[in-house]
Amino acid sequence: MEMTDPLRREEKKESSPDPKEESGPSRPDVSRPGRDSLLKRMKKVDPKQSEKYKQRTGQ
């Protein structure tokens, strides 16, 4: 059963542009550091803080 309401207009859906052809800047490819490398860097800066982080995250 198709309902047609004269007060409701039908929107025409245009084909979405290809994501590769967007006019804006592209998102940089940035990989997040793993938890192990994060802990190593934290130990270099502040050993006590890295221990607290280990306890909070359960590592």
Curated annotation (Swiss-Prot):
Changes after translation: May be modified by deamidation of its C-terminal glutamine to glutamate by the adjacently encoded deamidase. This could be a prerequisite to the subsequent conjugation, as shown in the other prokaryotic ubiquitin-like protein Pup.
Lineage top rank: taxon: Bacteria
Q: Where is this cross-link: Isoglutamyl lysine isopeptide (Gln-Lys) (interchain with K-? in acceptor proteins)?
A: 59
> What InterPro entries has UniProt attached to this entry?
UBact (IPR037543)
Identify the stretch(es) annotated as Disordered: 1-59
Q: Which GO terms describe its molecular function?
A: protein tag activity
Protein family: Belongs to the ubiquitin-like protein UBact family.
Q: Which NCBIfam families match?
A: ubiq_like_UBact
Q: What does this protein do?
A: May function as a protein modifier covalently attached to lysine residues of substrate proteins. This may serve to target the modified proteins for degradation by proteasomes.
Stated name of the protein: Prokaryotic ubiquitin-like protein UBact
Q: From which source organism is this entry?
A: Nitrospina gracilis (strain 3/211)
User: What gene name is listed for this protein?
Assistant: ubact
